[in-house]
Regions:
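Extracellular/luminal recognition modules and glycoprotein regions
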Residues: 11-20
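Short, extreme N-terminal segment that most often corresponds to the first beta-strand
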Residues: 1-11
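Low-complexity intrinsically disordered segments
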Residues: 21-111
Length: 111
């Protein structure tokens, strides 16, 4: 099963991927991030996630029974936290509806 949230801004690996691997690099931190629900950004002006719930919206995490169900939702990029860390899938690489695993660049991103 997969518990996930929607992230609005800059979901590409060069930004969000690096934010996730820098600031949410353990199962506990990833779970804490997801528990907040849908968000504008995982790392904003106040050096923390900016959740929709902070502006009064009710956007809890989404539950999918399988990884395939999660990956079929049509997002541009999808991220899964695994025992090896964050994995990124480009959902539209070849417009064939098949997720393509892409590399998350190394190095901290100052935001």
């Amino acid at each position: 099963s997969v518990l996930s949230v929607y992230h609005h801004w800059d979901g590409y690996p060069e930004w969000l991927g690096r934010i996730l691997t820098t600031h949410y690099n353990s199962r506990e931190l990833a779970s804490e991030l997801i528990d907040g629900g849908d968000m504008s950004a995982a790392w904003g002006d106040e050096n923390r996630a900016e959740y929709y719930s902070e502006r009064g919206e009710d956007c809890p995490p989404r539950y999918d029974e399988t990884r395939e169900q999660f990956l079929s939702e049509g997002e541009e990029f999808s991220y899964i936290f695994t025992s090896a860390g964050w994995v990124c899938y480009d959902m539209n690489e070849f417009n064939d509806k098949q997720p393509e695993m892409v590399e998350i660049p190394e190095g901290a991103l100052m935001a």
